[in-house]
Amino acid sequence: MSFDKFIIWIMAIGVIIGGLDRIFGNRFGLGEKFEEGFNSMGPLALGMVGIVTLAPVIAKVLGPVIIPIFNLVGADPAMFATILANDMGGYPLAMELAQNEEAGLLAGLIVAAMLGCTIVFSIPVGLGLIEYEDRPFFAKGLLAGLTTIPVGGIIGGLIAGFDIKMVLINMIPVIVLSVLLALGLVYIPKMMINGALIFGKFIVVVITVGLAAAAFEELTGVVIIPGMAPIMDGLVIIGQIGVVLLGTFPILTLIVKALEKPLNAVGQKLGMNATGAAGIVITLANSIPVYKMMKDMDPKGKVINTAWLVPATAALGDHLGFTAGVRPDMITPVV
């Protein structure tokens, strides 16, 4: 049995455990996580379905511009999609733009989970939740975290068994963008922060337009935006993810509890207080609580946690569930 299939079996066992705990009154808190996993389909659908339906249109419109630019350095146009999170349109857009399937998987599942998630989720959401006086620590942590993205992309690609030359060439645009973002955070931090917030709002507008147009077309048969994929294509993906998350959240709760002591010990050795050490563990499931905890962390903990969330956000949570739903064979490289 491959590791990917092993993970799916673990998630399946999580479904049974969570379901039983829900039946018997949520005695261990796993029944609640069972519900939480299934209920996450709503937010996921809001963030994903619109861009899934628009992906063919975006690829058709931007393709003539993007393809020649990326071909100049020998990179696959799919790498353009890494500016979006994997579960917020990065994956479907990458696969639409991809000239090589492996490059599409590298971009849409591995790199987008780090770079795209940072651009469209971690920065705008984090800035909205952390205290204003913590922004310098947040920026410093992002600066450190961004440097890990090319390394993570290369390692993930090699674990997936992709051709090393293909991986390295396609990392060139990622390295360039990571360096530009890092330089921006050093020299023009306010402009970078404002730009990230504006970009995040723009993505929400695009996603909403796609969702509304696709829903209208489904209900009436009237096409507003020609070339869109049917809304059901996106909803099928969401359903697949929801089934996996039924088991992911209960299992994740058990994993986080098991890892809590060793990771807390590591955190304390790195010089963080208890809150900072706890943030390292929680990020693996969901980074949103960590932003709210930052006000109680010491300065070192704030920087380390922000750097950690760039490659690690939801690695054992939504990103694991999403990958298992769309490409189970890519679970190991993504994680």
Give the positions of each predicted feature.
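Transmembrane alpha-helix boundary signature
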Residues: 53-61, 94-101, 158-161, 219-224
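Short amphipathic alpha-helical coupling elements at transmembrane boundaries
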Residues: 32-40, 67-72, 233, 261-272
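Alpha-helical membrane segments and immediately flanking helix-loop junctions
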Residues: 73-151, 273-328
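Interfacial/capping segments of alpha-helical transmembrane domains
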Residues: 58-76
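Signature of multi-pass transmembrane helix bundles
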Residues: 1-50, 107-115, 120-251, 255, ...
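Transmembrane alpha-helix/helix-exit interface in multi-pass inner-membrane proteins
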Residues: 52, 56, 249, 253-266
